[in-house]
């Protein structure tokens, strides 16, 4: 499964709408970088965040998710110490049938104890990506909206898969905004 280069990512974004909006060159001046890189795409975090809180003493249960588990905030945010937030990408992704996408955090945030987690983007999945952001430090941590948050790496299979995410009618297909757990 080879990793795909900038030329392929650019072509797929232009011709197939794989990433919209697509930033052709990496933006770096005065911001946490985002846009096309050599072998990946650095996505931006949008302005909507759901920060987990214990105000209502809710239990986080993936089978019965309670909306009072978090508070919604917009713009640049601060994640409390040892806490967690959900966010989503500015970009909308359309993954080709022969491609699997893996996400890694940005070193700028990782070096501050901020960890980003995203499950793989499966073949023929599409939508805005919900991002999990953990503040592993004992201090409040700042997250900047509309700046880079993670890097997506595109791996192309030797042949298209037999059953894609779209074929399975996956529950997170075409998600928009922050999407909480579904069964």
Curated annotation (Swiss-Prot):
Stored InterPro entries: dCTP_deaminase, dUTPase-like_sf, dUTPase_trimeric
Keywords: Hydrolase, Nucleotide metabolism, Nucleotide-binding
The UniProt record lists the keyword Hydrolase: yes
UniProt-listed Enzyme Commission number(s): 3.5.4.13
Matches recorded under Pfam families: DCD
GO molecular function: dCTP deaminase activity; nucleotide binding
Binding site for dCTP: 106-111, 151, 165, 175
Reactions catalysed according to its record: dCTP + H2O + H(+) = dUTP + NH4(+)
Catalytic residues in the record: 132
GO biological process terms held by the UniProt record: dUMP biosynthetic process; dUTP biosynthetic process
Pathway: Pyrimidine metabolism; dUMP biosynthesis; dUMP from dCTP (dUTP route): step 1/2
Domain of life: Bacteria
Function (record text): Catalyzes the deamination of dCTP to dUTP.
Family: Belongs to the dCTP deaminase family.
Subunit note: Homotrimer.
Protein name per Swiss-Prot or TrEMBL: dCTP deaminase
Native source organism of the sequence: Gluconobacter oxydans (strain 621H)
Gene: dcd
